[in-house]
Amino acid sequence: PISNEIPLDQAAVIEPLAVGYHAYVRSGAQEGDVALVGGGGPIGLLLSAVLKAKGITVIMTELSAKRKEKAKESGVADYILDPSEVDLAEEVMKITGDKGVDVAFECTSVNKVLDSLVELTKPAGVVVIVSIWSHPATVNVHSVVMKELDVRGTIAYVNNHKETIKLVEEGKIDLEPFITQRIKLDDLVSEGFERLIHNNESAVKIIVNPNLK
C-alpha cells in the first residue's frame, strides 16, 4: 500500500519507477559504484533517480537537448554527456580514473549505445539491457569475453513496489519533476496522445485527472 503522504499524482509514477528499481536490483550495483546510463528517456531518468538514491554516481549519455535539460532539472545525473559534443570514451575514463564504469544500463534500443556501454564498462563489470528491442542487435562478444563482462536482461519489475515506495516515502526520490503535464480526461487525445506521439522528447509522465476543470 502507498501511504497518504504520497500525493496520488506522484503515486502514478511509482509503476515506471519500479521498472528502474528492478533494473538496479538486476545490476547488483553497490553504493559508491559508478554507473553509465545510456539514454535519458523516461525509464533512463527514473532509473538514474533510483541509482542516485542508492549512493551511486551516475553518468548519463543523451543526444536530445530537451532530455538533457530534463535530466539536469531533475538532478538525477552527476554527469550528462552528449556523444555528439564530446569524446564519450575520453570523458568516462577521465571520470573513472581510466578504470571504466562498474555497471552500465542500456535504455535506448540503439546498437551504437550498447556498443559504447560494452566498451566503457570495466573488466568484470555488468551491462544491463533495460529497453525492449523490436529489432535484432549485435554485441561485441570478443570484448564481453576478454573483459569477463556480465550482460543481463531486465523486464518490468518483480515484487519491487514495496522497496520503490519506501524510497519515495523516505524522501530519497522526489517524483514531482517527472510529472511533465496534468490534463483533463476530455483532453486525453488532443493533449495527451498528441504530445506522446509528436513531442515525446519532453514528456516523462502525463497525468490524466478526471477532476481537473
Residue spans for each PLM region:
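Residue-level signal for nonpolar/aromatic packing positions in well-ordered secondary structure
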Residues: 2, 20, 51, 71, ...
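Glycine-rich cofactor phosphate-binding loops and adjacent beta1-alpha1 units
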Residues: 27-29, 59, 69, 74-150, ...
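Short glycine/proline- and acidic residue-enriched helix-loop micro-motifs
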Residues: 3-9, 174-179
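Conserved acidic E/D residue at the C-terminus of a beta-strand in Rossmann-like folds
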Residues: 62, 131, 155
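Residue-level signal for the nucleotide or nucleotide-sugar donor/cofactor binding architecture
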Residues: 15, 108, 156-159, 183
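C-terminal hydrophobic helical "lid"/dimerization subdomain
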Residues: 115-119, 158, 162-213
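Mid-domain Rossmann-like dinucleotide-binding core that forms the NAD(H)/NADP(H) cofactor-binding site
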Residues: 4-85
